[in-house]
Amino acid sequence: MQPSVRIRFAKENDWDEIEQITSQNFSFQRADQQELNGFRTLVLEFEGQVIGSCLIQMEEQFENPSLKLLWLEILPDSRKQGFGTLLLATLKSLVAQESLLGIHVTCQEELIPYFEMNDFQLEIGDKEEGVEGYHLMWHLSL
Protein backbone atom coordinates (compact mmCIF):
# COMPACT_ATOMS: atom_id res chain seq x y z
CA MET A 1 0.00 0.00 0.00
CA GLN A 2 1.25 3.48 -0.95
CA PRO A 3 2.13 5.79 1.99
CA SER A 4 -0.32 8.67 2.44
CA VAL A 5 1.18 12.15 1.89
CA ARG A 6 -1.00 15.27 1.78
CA ILE A 7 -0.09 18.97 1.59
CA ARG A 8 -2.72 21.55 2.49
CA PHE A 9 -3.17 24.95 4.08
CA ALA A 10 -3.09 24.81 7.87
CA LYS A 11 -6.27 24.63 9.92
CA GLU A 12 -6.83 25.88 13.44
CA ASN A 13 -6.39 22.44 14.99
CA ASP A 14 -2.91 22.08 13.38
CA TRP A 15 -1.22 24.83 15.37
CA ASP A 16 -0.04 22.78 18.34
CA GLU A 17 1.73 20.36 15.97
CA ILE A 18 3.15 23.20 13.87
CA GLU A 19 4.47 24.87 17.01
CA GLN A 20 6.26 21.65 18.02
CA ILE A 21 7.85 21.39 14.57
CA THR A 22 8.97 25.00 14.28
CA SER A 23 9.61 26.36 17.75
CA GLN A 24 13.14 24.92 17.95
CA ASN A 25 14.34 27.04 15.04
CA PHE A 26 11.88 29.89 14.51
CA SER A 27 9.97 32.51 16.44
CA PHE A 28 6.40 31.22 16.49
CA GLN A 29 3.12 33.14 16.07
CA ARG A 30 -0.28 31.49 16.01
CA ALA A 31 -2.44 31.61 12.86
CA ASP A 32 -4.73 34.46 13.82
CA GLN A 33 -1.75 36.81 14.18
CA GLN A 34 -0.11 35.56 10.97
CA GLU A 35 -3.10 35.78 8.66
CA LEU A 36 -3.71 39.39 9.66
CA ASN A 37 -0.26 40.15 8.24
CA GLY A 38 -0.82 38.26 4.98
CA PHE A 39 1.03 35.10 6.01
CA ARG A 40 -0.14 31.60 5.04
CA THR A 41 1.04 28.25 6.37
CA LEU A 42 1.13 24.95 4.50
CA VAL A 43 1.39 21.66 6.36
CA LEU A 44 2.60 18.28 5.17
CA GLU A 45 0.83 15.23 6.58
CA PHE A 46 2.37 11.77 6.38
CA GLU A 47 0.23 8.83 7.45
CA GLY A 48 -2.21 11.27 9.12
CA GLN A 49 0.41 13.13 11.20
CA VAL A 50 1.63 16.67 10.50
CA ILE A 51 5.40 16.27 10.04
CA GLY A 52 6.28 19.49 8.24
CA SER A 53 5.20 23.04 7.57
CA CYS A 54 6.21 26.17 5.75
CA LEU A 55 5.25 29.80 6.24
CA ILE A 56 4.86 32.03 3.19
CA GLN A 57 3.98 35.65 2.54
CA MET A 58 2.95 37.34 -0.69
CA GLU A 59 5.52 39.99 -1.65
CA GLU A 60 3.58 42.67 -3.46
CA GLN A 61 5.94 45.55 -2.78
CA PHE A 62 7.99 44.54 -5.81
CA GLU A 63 6.81 45.29 -9.34
CA ASN A 64 7.20 41.54 -9.88
CA PRO A 65 5.00 39.83 -7.26
CA SER A 66 6.39 36.69 -5.67
CA LEU A 67 6.19 34.52 -2.56
CA LYS A 68 8.55 34.89 0.34
CA LEU A 69 9.37 31.63 2.13
CA LEU A 70 9.87 32.47 5.81
CA TRP A 71 10.33 28.96 7.12
CA LEU A 72 10.32 25.39 5.94
CA GLU A 73 10.61 22.83 8.70
CA ILE A 74 10.33 19.03 8.85
CA LEU A 75 10.35 16.93 12.04
CA PRO A 76 13.92 15.65 12.66
CA ASP A 77 12.95 11.97 12.28
CA SER A 78 11.36 12.70 8.88
CA ARG A 79 14.20 14.72 7.32
CA LYS A 80 16.22 13.61 4.29
CA GLN A 81 13.25 11.72 2.84
CA GLY A 82 12.12 14.32 0.28
CA PHE A 83 9.34 15.92 2.32
CA GLY A 84 10.87 19.42 2.21
CA THR A 85 11.26 19.09 -1.55
CA LEU A 86 7.56 18.14 -1.77
CA LEU A 87 6.63 21.31 0.11
CA LEU A 88 8.82 23.37 -2.24
CA ALA A 89 7.21 21.70 -5.29
CA THR A 90 3.79 22.66 -3.90
CA LEU A 91 4.96 26.26 -3.48
CA LYS A 92 6.22 26.28 -7.07
CA SER A 93 2.79 25.09 -8.26
CA LEU A 94 1.14 27.80 -6.17
CA VAL A 95 3.38 30.42 -7.80
CA ALA A 96 2.25 29.24 -11.25
CA GLN A 97 -1.45 29.15 -10.24
CA GLU A 98 -1.30 32.67 -8.79
CA SER A 99 0.65 34.08 -11.79
CA LEU A 100 3.58 35.06 -9.60
CA LEU A 101 7.18 35.23 -10.76
CA GLY A 102 8.98 33.18 -8.13
CA ILE A 103 9.90 32.41 -4.54
CA HIS A 104 12.36 34.34 -2.35
CA VAL A 105 14.09 32.79 0.66
CA THR A 106 16.76 33.97 3.09
CA CYS A 107 18.74 31.17 4.68
CA GLN A 108 21.92 30.32 6.53
CA GLU A 109 24.99 29.36 4.52
CA GLU A 110 24.69 25.63 5.24
CA LEU A 111 21.23 25.55 3.58
CA ILE A 112 22.35 27.07 0.27
CA PRO A 113 23.13 23.66 -1.34
CA TYR A 114 19.66 22.37 -0.39
CA PHE A 115 17.91 25.29 -2.05
CA GLU A 116 20.25 25.19 -5.07
CA MET A 117 19.39 21.47 -5.44
CA ASN A 118 15.76 22.66 -5.70
CA ASP A 119 16.59 25.15 -8.50
CA PHE A 120 16.97 28.28 -6.36
CA GLN A 121 19.71 30.71 -7.37
CA LEU A 122 21.85 32.76 -5.04
CA GLU A 123 21.04 36.45 -5.45
CA ILE A 124 24.00 38.79 -5.40
CA GLY A 125 23.16 42.31 -4.36
CA ASP A 126 22.52 44.66 -1.51
CA LYS A 127 22.08 43.10 1.90
CA GLU A 128 18.67 43.77 3.42
CA GLU A 129 19.12 45.91 6.53
CA GLY A 130 18.68 43.92 9.73
CA VAL A 131 18.39 40.57 7.91
CA GLU A 132 21.15 38.02 8.27
CA GLY A 133 21.64 35.25 5.77
CA TYR A 134 21.84 34.60 2.07
CA HIS A 135 19.09 35.51 -0.38
CA LEU A 136 18.02 32.94 -2.95
CA MET A 137 15.32 33.05 -5.62
CA TRP A 138 13.44 30.45 -7.64
CA HIS A 139 12.10 31.90 -10.89
CA LEU A 140 9.04 30.54 -12.66
CA SER A 141 10.01 29.53 -16.19
CA LEU A 142 7.55 30.89 -18.71
What are these regions (language model features)?
Residues 1-31, 45:
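Short amphipathic alpha-helix that is part of the acyltransferase structural core
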Residues 32-38:
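Short loop/turn motifs at secondary-structure junctions and domain boundaries
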Residues 43, 49-58, 65-68, 73:
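Conserved beta-strand in the GNAT
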Residues 59-70, 79, 129-132:
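A conserved beta-turn-beta hairpin within the catalytic core of GNAT-like acetyltransferases
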Residues 74, 80-93, 117:
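Conserved acetyl-CoA-binding loop-helix of GNAT-fold acetyltransferases
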Residues 75, 108:
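Residue-level recognition of the GNAT/N-acetyltransferase active site
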Residues 95-107:
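Conserved GNAT acetyl-CoA-binding A-motif
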Residues 106, 121-137:
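Conserved catalytic-core motifs of GNAT/GCN5-like acyltransferases
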